Swiss-Prot record:
Region described as Disordered: 1-20, 185-240
Domain UBX: 278-356
Binding residue positions for Zn(2+) 3: C124, C129, C147, H150
PROSITE patterns recorded: UBX, ZF_AN1
Signal peptide: none
The organism of origin for this protein: Dictyostelium discoideum
Protein name: AN1-type zinc finger and UBX domain-containing protein DDB_G0268260
Residues that bind Zn(2+) 4: C139, C142, H156, C158
Taxonomic classification: Eukaryota, Amoebozoa, Evosea, Eumycetozoa, Dictyostelia
Low complexity bias spans: 1-16, 185-236
Length: 391
């Protein structure tokens, strides 16, 4: 076994440099600023007052003996009542006033829901309309604001004058009339009192004359009061302008037309429903064949007798002999003119039975040259077998 030679001095220096390079981590973390500690901390804590970094043990103000601990003050935060954002309050003196002032400044500048920043809306001046637009649309004639639907003069029945509230003039007239009536009543009462005083002074001399005069004066005063009351009642009535009356009449006509249209539409819908229901009616028809067998099918109310005939010809089991259809085994058969009539018109709803009466084709073929108006010639024949006559 060969013995390893001890490392030389330059080799030892190279190893020490390599170890220093591998284990040196000063560029990653931060050392604690406490002189007795100086721990390398990879997640240091920064002090708010002295702006220095410390380890976990010395992060508190008292642990690292912070010099700026006297500068610390209590901080108060108040939420905004609109956006719920926290607002810092700097001074503690007069908290109520400072909080109100800070909140008002915040709402005027930084608040999200600031009313001054919100877009304005313009309401339509038409009474029946309640829409509002973000753009002001004025009429050229009456110069009042309307929505996009009623912006044209024909849509809002423009009169060419600015719109005034309909109750403004009548209220003013009623107030003036009431004031005038009150003044007239006061003057009348004063005159009555004067007349009564004069009459009382002259009662000793002319009792009869004074009584007559008093009665006359009282009657006159009563008449005046009645007239004034009647005038006040008449004046209290609202005097509408002519344009508003026209608008009221037009609105009534418009609503009456709408009612008439609705009633007509309801009638049409009822008729359509009746037609639809009638078309959905089903008639159950049973057919007894010449051999006594029975076939049955559900036909619609609008189906004709020809469709019944086609069903019989495609589903019969009694052969190919000619037949006539009857409602009774000994009754009159249906004629050719009744082929295009519906089941409802023939009275076969809701349930009915038809009988197939056999016919002799040879007799009908021989008698076809004669002009006999017998019922058998007009009877309903399903079809004739042309090969039967050429035996």
């Amino acid at each position: 076994m060969q013995q390893q030679s001890p490392p030389t001095a330059p080799q030892q220096q190279q190893q020490q440099q390599r170890e220093r390079e591998t284990y040196q981590l000063d560029h990653i973390g931060v050392h604690c600023n406490v002189t007795d500690c100086r721990v390398l901390d990879f997640l240091p804590f920064n002090c708010d007052l002295c702006n220095l970094s410390f380890c976990m043990e010395h992060k508190g103000y008292e642990n690292h003996k912070c010099k700026n601990i006297e500068q610390r003050e209590n901080k108060i935060v108040h939420p905004c009542p609109v956006c719920n954002c926290l607002i810092k309050v700097d001074s503690l003196a007069n908290l109520d006033q400072t909080v109100r002032f800070i909140i008002s400044v915040h709402m005027d500048t930084d608040c999200k829901f600031n009313q001054s920043k919100a877009p304005k809306s313009f309401k339509c001046s038409l009474k029946t309309c309640k829409t509002s637009e973000f753009v002001e649309v004025k009429c050229d004639k009456c110069k009042s604001n309307y929505c996009l639907k009623h912006r044209f003069p024909t849509n809002h029945s423009c009169t060419g004058k600015p719109i005034i509230n309909s109750l403004s003039k009548p209220i003013n007239t009623t107030i003036n009339n009431n004031i005038n009536n009150n003044t007239n009543n006061i003057n009348n009462n004063i005159n009555n009192n004067k007349n009564n005083n004069n009459n009382n002074n002259n009662n000793n001399n002319n009792n009869n004359n004074n009584n007559n005069n008093n009665n006359n004066n009282n009657n006159n005063n009563n008449n005046n009061n009645n007239n004034n009351n009647n005038n006040s009642n008449n004046n209290n009535k609202l005097i509408y302008p002519g344009n508003i009356k026209k608008n009221i009449v037009e609105d009534k006509q418009y609503y009456l037309e709408q009612k008439n249209q609705k009633s007509e539409l309801q009638k049409l819908r009822e008729e359509q429903n009746q037609r639809y229901k009638s078309s959905e009616e089903i008639g159950e028809i049973g057919i007894i064949q010449t051999n006594g067998a029975r076939i049955q099918y559900d036909f619609m109310a609008t189906d004709t007798l020809r469709s019944v005939q086609k069903f019989i010809n495609s589903n019969r089991t009694d052969g190919t002999c000619s037949y006539a259809l009857c409602t009774q085994p000994t009754g009159n058969p249906f004629t050719l003119n009744q082929l295009n009539l519906s089941i409802r018109q023939l009275g076969l709803l809701p349930v009915s039975t038809l009988y197939m009466l056999p016919l002799d084709n040879s007799n009908n073929f021989n008698n076809s040259g004669n002009n006999n108006n017998n019922s058998s010639d007009q009877s309903l024949l399903s079809y004739l077998n042309p090969f039967k006559y050429f035996k």
